[in-house]
């Protein structure tokens, strides 16, 4: 299992994944990224025409690489720090001895 997959599985199991996802969504909205991607999708659809031959999957394939490059580095760093904090906190909790009451 890759480190990325292990972190993903761990955050799902601890319930932290939804917190990280909520943080990401709010930050992307705050910086205007969502509006930018929405406009990019609209422009691609206008460019391709309205003949219904362009599928959602094709749109996603075309937009995803461009959209990823538009995510500000500050947001990427913030999320990475949040994930590290979560992993560190949970590792420290796992290292603490059990209370034998």
Curated annotation (Swiss-Prot):
Keywords: Activator, Chromatin regulator, Cytoplasm, mRNA transport, Nucleus, Protein transport, Transcription, Transcription regulation, Translocation, Transport. One of its GO terms (cellular component) is SAGA complex. GO terms for biological process: heterochromatin boundary formation; mRNA export from nucleus; poly(A)+ mRNA export from nucleus; positive regulation of transcription by RNA polymerase II; protein transport; transcription elongation by RNA polymerase II. It is found in: Nucleus, Nucleoplasm; Cytoplasm. Coiled coil: none annotated. InterPro entries: TF_ENY2, TF_EnY2_sf. Its main location: nucleus. The keyword Kinase does not apply. One of its GO terms (molecular function) is TFIID-class transcription factor complex binding. Component of the nuclear pore complex (NPC)-associated AMEX complex (anchoring and mRNA export complex), composed of at least e(y)2 and xmas-2. Component of the SAGA transcription coactivator-HAT complexes, at least composed of Ada2b, e(y)2, Pcaf/Gcn5, Taf10 and Nipped-A/Trrap. Within the SAGA complex, e(y)2, Sgf11, and not/nonstop form an additional subcomplex of SAGA called the DUB module (deubiquitination module). Component of the THO complex, composed of at least e(y)2, HPR1, THO2, THOC5, THOC6 and THOC7. Interacts with e(y)1. Interacts with su(Hw) (via zinc fingers). Belongs to the ENY2 family. Involved in mRNA export coupled transcription activation by association with both the AMEX and the SAGA complexes. The SAGA complex is a multiprotein complex that activates transcription by remodeling chromatin and mediating histone acetylation and deubiquitination. Within the SAGA complex, participates in a subcomplex that specifically deubiquitinates histone H2B. The SAGA complex is recruited to specific gene promoters by activators, where it is required for transcription. Required for nuclear receptor-mediated transactivation. This is Enhancer of yellow 2 transcription factor. It comes from Drosophila erecta (Fruit fly). The lineage of its organism: Eukaryota, Metazoa, Ecdysozoa, Arthropoda, Hexapoda.
């Amino acid at each position: 299992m890759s480190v990325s997959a292990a972190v993903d599985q761990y955050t799902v199991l601890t319930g932290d994944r939804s917190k990280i996802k909520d943080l990401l969504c709010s930050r992307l909205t705050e910086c205007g990224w969502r509006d930018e991607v929405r406009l990019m999708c609209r422009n691609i659809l206008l460019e391709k025409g309205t003949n219904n031959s362009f599928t959602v999957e094709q749109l996603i394939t075309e937009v995803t690489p461009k959209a990823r490059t538009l995510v500000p580095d500050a947001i990427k760093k913030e999320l990475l720090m949040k994930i590290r904090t979560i992993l560190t906190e949970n590792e420290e909790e796992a290292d603490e001895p059990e209370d034998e009451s």
